[in-house]
Regions:
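C-terminal extracellular loops and terminal segments
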Residues: 309-318, 357-375, 423-435, 439, ...
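Active-site-proximal polar cores
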Residues: 61-62
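Residues embedded in well-ordered regular secondary structure
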Residues: 85-88, 392-403, 479-484
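Conserved small-residue
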Residues: 217-218, 223-224, 331-428, 468, ...
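C-terminal beta-barrel architecture of Gram-negative outer-membrane proteins
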Residues: 413, 447-519
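Catalytic-site beta-strand/loop segments enriched in glycine and acidic/polar residues
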Residues: 117-125, 153-162, 406-429
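Extracellular/periplasmic, surface-exposed regions of secreted and cell-surface proteins
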Residues: 1-56, 65-373, 504, 508-585
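Glycine-rich, aromatic-lined ligand/substrate-binding cores of catalytic
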Residues: 427-460
């Protein structure tokens, strides 16, 4: 062979990623025909592809074989053929998207009336590498805003939408929304209220339709209104071909009948106000009912069905909450200061999800939050063998002193998965978000800071090494070691240390449940703005600002050894301090 040629010139590969983004927007004022009328169009096309090239060639070779038995003797060996470089190319990934939007708009003031109206058609087409990836949607919408005398406002939107993801006969949906507002501060009876600068009441109602569909792990979209068939190999053990695999096709999931859009009924009321010539206030509350949510109907069928149960539009979830925002700016002599904050509280409840019948009430999930944590209630650790003997039997694994002792929730004298109950809050999103900011400036010298926090937020501390040590050859953290149970430390935070997996201790339970709430100093900045007269002397610079900025410098939380936003086996969030100069021309 020719090793040098083979290693250096026999083959190479090249990968190409190609992207095309094209946008076209056209608008035309038609006031010459109808005052206030206009027309607009927009086209966009995105294309992405990944191409892989493979180049290869062959070489002729010559070699020598030497034999020394009766003196040196050489034998020539040759073979192969020299060929031209061959090329093979393939596309291993691609995606494309086309969007079109066009319509008419009308904007005009008629006496005390302000009118804006829009009639629009949208079309979207998406396609990508793989099976069942083509999706198209279209919307026909009409939106109208009407204002009267700068006091009363009415908005109406009507939307008809179509989606290819849903079954024939159910592709179209109608979504109406309406909102109204009343600016009380413009009324004559409010003119003498000096401390109210602006006051508006508003309310809205709408129905939103969505074409969400359940998907499998590779994001494939199935046609759930059809039966799904699966092909597999089955072993027939007879005759000479006993070890051969023969394909078989069977129904793996039943079809969904009358599939439709998921619907959200949204209600909102709010107040916007400006008080005392500087205090801006926003208060609003909302209620939402989502229905026809896609859920599995598996809980409604016996396990002898023999195939996967269909998905159904049967889920119902209620959500409600409130948001409050405050901002106040005031100037006293040469000092300008600003302070404000936001608070949001949100809660939800599962009303229906076709849940299977449960043996005990504590196992029922309907009526609880989305993404609620379920686990066992820990009552401490077993002190000794007598404590174990006098306690309900725990069936997860053999227990010894130092293992977690659980509460018998259902009272059957045995601890197992039937003793799980709702514990803590959601691990996905907190119920409460809040933030507040403050800042001040004096003759160009100033500072600003923004804090952000969460509450009613849970974490399950199941990270191996740190909280579950020595499992599958993982390491042991000093945090666990210092807080483990020992006969001398009966009030420990964590169970005894074990070199083997311990099914009893590593169930989801209140030992591993932690409050994930936190308060962080998100941003803080000290700065100096150079005087304008100095900038004018440069005849080049319009402004200049020297600053020192810090990000995520402080965190107050109850998870001491990890960041509450990234407490798993991942890179921690970074703290940073930046010194910079911002220049404007």
């Amino acid at each position: 062979m020719n090793p040098i040629a083979q290693s250096q010139g026999a083959a190479y590969s090249k990968g190409h990623t190609r992207n095309l983004y094209a946008d076209l927007t056209l608008s035309q004022d038609l006031s010459g025909f109808v005052k206030g009328l206009g027309v607009n169009f927009r086209l966009s096309y995105d294309n992405y592809s990944s191409v892989w090239e493979k180049h290869s060639k062959t070489f002729a070779f010559k070699g020598y074989s030497t034999r020394w038995a009766d003196g040196p003797f050489y034998t020539t060996v040759s073979g192969g053929e020299s060929g031209e470089m061959e090329t093979d190319a393939s596309t291993n990934d691609w995606a494309r998207q086309f969007n079109f939007a066009g319509g008419f708009d009308y904007n005009r003031s008629l006496g005390k009336f302000d009118i804006y109206s829009q009639l629009k058609w949208d079309y979207e087409y998406r396609d990508a590498y793989g099976l069942n990836t083509t999706v198209y949607r279209q919307n026909v919408s009409w939106y109208t805003h009407l204002g009267f005398n700068k006091r009363y406002y009415l908005d109406l939107a009507l939307l008809a939408s179509q989606s290819s993801l849903l079954a024939p006969g159910h592709k179209w949906a109608f979504s109406p929304t309406v909102s109204a507002a009343w600016v009380l501060s413009e009324e004559n009876f409010m003119k003498n209220v000096s401390w109210i600068d602006f006051l508006k009441l508003r309310a809205s109602f709408g129905v939103i339709n969505a074409d969400y569909l359940p998907r499998n792990g590779d994001d494939t979209v199935y046609n759930y209104w059809d039966q799904i068939y699966t092909t597999t190999g089955t072993m027939y053990r007879f005759d000479s071909g006993y070890n051969s695999a023969f394909g078989s096709t069977y129904i793996s999931r039943l079809a969904t009948t009358n599939s439709t859009h998921e619907k959200a009924y949204k209600y909102n009321v709010g107040i916007d106000a400006t008080l005392f010539k500087g205090l801006n206030l926003t208060v609003e509350g909302y209620y939402q009912r989502r229905k026809d949510i896609w859920v599995s109907s598996e809980g409604q069928y016996s396990s002898v069905l023999g195939m996967d149960a269909p998905f159904e539009n049967a889920g119902i979830v209620d959500s409600w909450g409130t948001e409050i925002g405050l901002d106040y700016t005031k100037q006293i002599s040469d000092v300008v200061f600003n302070i404000g904050g936001n608070f949001a509280w949100n809660r939800n409840e599962i009303k229906e999800q076709m849940e299977e019948p449960r043996l005990y009430d504590n196992l029922v999930q309907t009526g609880n939050r989305l993404n609620q944590v379920y686990g066992l209630i820990a009552e401490g650790f077993f002190k000794d063998e007598a404590d174990i003997a006098s306690s309900p039997t725990q069936n997860f694994s053999t227990v010894v002193p130092g293992d977690i002792k659980y509460k018998d929730v259902n009272g059957d004298g045995t601890i197992d998965s039937n003793d799980q109950i709702a514990i803590g809050y959601s691990t996905v999103a907190p119920e409460i978000y809040y933030s507040f900011h403050l800042g001040a400036e004096w003759r160009g010298i100033g500072f600003s800071a923004m804090f952000q926090g969460t509450a009613n937020y849970s974490a399950v501390l199941n990270t191996k090494s740190m909280f579950w040590p020595l499992i599958n050859n993982t390491t042991l953290s000093s945090h666990y070691y210092e807080n483990r149970w020992t006969p001398e430390n009966l009030n420990a935070k964590y169970p005894r240390l074990s070199s083997q997996s311990n099914a009893n201790n590593y169930q989801t339970n209140t030992i591993w449940l932690e409050d994930r709430s936190f308060l962080k100093l998100r941003n803080v900045e000290l700065y100096y703005k150079f005087p304008k007269n100095l900038m004018q002397k440069t005849k080049i610079l319009g402004s200049a600002k020297l600053y020192v900025r810090g990000v995520d410098l402080l965190c107050f939380d109850k998870i001491d050894v990890a960041d509450p936003e990234s407490y798993g086996a991942t890179n921690p969030l970074n703290k940073s301090v930046v010194v910079g100069l911002k220049i404007g021309f």
